[in-house]
């Protein structure tokens, strides 16, 4: 059975996915993985354990196979159909069998999330899955029966934190008398280091990749029933978006929320591990996105951030099966025409162009109309996917924030080519200039990597000059960390010494904060619409909120401001801007997005 499933996985499944047999294909893949778990990864204390793990994990279809087969134009539909029909006669193994909602029996789950906003969103999905199976999400680590580490693999330091935490958990099990504590590693690190995690002496009980969270209750059931001591599911799905799962929101104040609109990435930048840990791009059904936004609006949320690894390459092209006529969504959607997703002029891709579909610009238009009083942000985009019509939409829709993340990574065309970013310094600057012309005062943020393979002093200086030219409002700056499996790991040489990487990173950080402080000084006297989202972490004497441009503003919680409430919009005058991080503001009046837009109309004191 295993050999037959193995052959199917490696030769036929991905072609079937292309021929609209996704559900059948995924069931067969899942059978392969789950039989791999239940039959071949039972953990015994014998000397053959590590070899057994290696032998079985190497049979898992690789991402290269995934990509290669997904671009295959040969139609093998008839040949594959008979094979799949034969395999359909087999019943699903217990690993994927549906569980009753009370299977968790109230056992307490503690989740620690590391890394990006997508991981935060994934945690909310995991919470929903666990609660629906009868588990309780715990707010107290000390009472938890199960601990999940929701991990990041983007840099070596991110993984080092997890190894340290696993060491701590191993000690807690031993020294605090909690030998039955179940420890699971979820997310990108689980996908990337599945073999190492299972072979280590950290006593990891469960390893689950980003596309396999639905199987968590089943995996736990096999552990709790004593069927095996370790369970793994690290399948990369061609269509999993968790669209039907209602996230359990983790926000305490119910002001802002994340909405995941797509998963995976096709860009294959030479330094990046994301395509190997999260798979290929797939867009979530548009109706489900708009319903979630409407639900958040009904709950009183005031700000939504649309999420994706490459969010503005959203391209939904499947027909909707939803025949519900009671909502605004279907009526609007049916008016949309499918469009080709093409990179901006001066930018290029290394992958095959997708089918015509509903693009990110059209999605943003629909989302912005669900509730004109909800702010809309999005992250993380790619510079190639900023067409002019998207910029015009942002300009004309008051509730789409005038704050764009435009990851540069480097200011050197030579380094950008080595990174396989698909653009030059000149084309990036052209995009920035266009944004500044179409959206005056728009805040721009970015990502930068210092010390990439082959980076010279001149390359580094070009990055510094780009930062000085643009004047970023926020930046995520890191030293290059070589990741296995990436193009850089296979083809390039990590030849910049660590000390030089550090010194260059220091200069990058210093340049950013110098320009930011200059820009903050220019804010004094400007009026912004600030959404108050809580109190300052340093002192409850100050409210804290954010402008449309995502600048943090402190407002004194004094006698004059007793009417200020969390979750409301206020017009605020900036009175102090000497901090590198926050501004100080004085509230003028309570307002709304539409009211503020009518008063200022993006002119006068508003940036």
UniProtKB/Swiss-Prot annotation:
Binding site for [4Fe-4S] cluster 1: 116, 152, 188
PANTHER family to which the protein is assigned, alphabetical: CDK5 REGULATORY SUBUNIT-ASSOCIATED PROTEIN 1, MITOCHONDRIAL TRNA METHYLTHIOTRANSFERASE CDK5RAP1
PROSITE patterns in alphabetical order: MTTASE_N, MTTASE_RADICAL, RADICAL_SAM, TRAM
Cofactor note: Binds 2 [4Fe-4S] clusters. One cluster is coordinated with 3 cysteines and an exchangeable S-adenosyl-L-methionine.
Residues annotated to bind [4Fe-4S] cluster 2: 265, 269, 272
Superkingdom: Eukaryota
Family the entry assigns: Belongs to the methylthiotransferase family. MiaB subfamily.
Keyword Metal-binding: yes
Source species of the chain: Dictyostelium discoideum
Molecular function in Gene Ontology: 4 iron, 4 sulfur cluster binding; metal ion binding; N6-isopentenyladenosine methylthiotransferase activity
Domain TRAM: 521-589
Required co-factors: [4Fe-4S] cluster
Keyword list, A-Z: 4Fe-4S, Iron, Iron-sulfur, Metal-binding, S-adenosyl-L-methionine
Gene Ontology annotations for the cellular component aspect, listed alphabetically: cytosol; mitochondrion
Biological processes annotated in GO: mitochondrial tRNA modification
Domain MTTase N-terminal as annotated: residue spans: 107-225
NCBIfam families: MiaB/RimO family radical SAM methylthiotransferase
Boundaries of every Radical SAM core domain copy: 251-518
Name of one Pfam family that matches: Radical_SAM
Purpose: Probable regulator of CDK5 activity.
Entry keyword Membrane: no
Protein name: CDK5RAP1-like protein
